Structures are given as structure tokens and as C-alpha cells.
Amino acid sequence: MNSTHHYEQLIEIFNSCFADEFNTRLIKGDDEPIYLPADAEVPYNRIVFAHGFYASAIHEISHWCIAGKARRDLVDFGYWYCPDGRDAQTQSQFEDVEVKPQALDWLFCVAAGYPFNVSCDNLEGDFEPDRVVFQRRVHAQVMDYLANGIPERPARFIKACLLYTSD
């Protein structure tokens, strides 16, 4: 089993799975993560993850796996994002939309042999999110995926991670 984790591995795995069929590439960025659809300057879609962080790459892949065709034509999938420093209500909304991506993160991390940690992503907020409650919600979604089936794109990525880590 491959016990070291480098972002280049995820780029190789993702691009081998999806670059041709979905015209999408995983790219290391130097700033905040963002999804950029193909345009006049770059002929392919880009999932740009933050600063070469392995966990960021996993998480951005999760968002891409959830986004439908129409959303994949929009910058950052057209998603709403409120930065760190959220109040209780906004944090609750943030966690609602993060359950499914973080459940995929968990599955991807297990397949890659990488430790998973939920992220409430609110270090500067005016209250402390209940990380345990959020983790239970994410875990429940993981169990739902396992019981009822993992969608095709995430299942393909999981299989590729498992094959890579078994070498």
C-alpha cells in the first residue's frame, strides 16, 4: 500500500478518470480553491485546489462529483459561499450544503488511506460550531451512500484510489 500522500497522485488519479470524458482537470492552485469551466482562453474545465493541500484536492473533487451538468458550466458551480466568520444561522446553512461533499471526502479519504476530519470551516465565527453533531450528520450520509449506492463519478474515483493505493 502507498503510505505517502502527495497531491500529484490525486491529480494523476483524477485526470486519468475524468480528463477525457468530462474535459476536466485537477490543478494545484496558489490561492483559494475554485472551479473554472472551459472558456476562450483555456479549453478544459479546471478544479483548482488550494496551495497543494491533499485534503483541499479531495474536497474540491467532492464538490465536482456532486455538481450536475448545468452547474459544471458555471464558475464555482454557481454555489453560494460565505467565508469564515459566519454567525450561527449562516453556519447552519453552510453545514447543510457541506454534508454530502464531506461524506464523499470521507469515502475518498478511506479509499486513499488518508485521514479524514470534518471541517466546520468557521475559525473566526462568533460562536463554536458543534463539530460532533456535524460529524454525525456527515457519517449518516456516508452510511446512506453505502446502503443505497454511491453515484457513478464518485464510485469511479473511489475505485481508482483503491487501485492506486493497492500497488
Regions found by a protein language model. Give the residues of each.
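Auxiliary, metal-adjacent structural segments of Zn-dependent hydrolase domains
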Residues: 1-40, 91-96
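Post-HEXXH active-site segment of zinc metalloproteases
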Residues: 68-98
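An active-site-proximal "capping" alpha-helix that borders the catalytic cofactor pocket
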Residues: 96-110
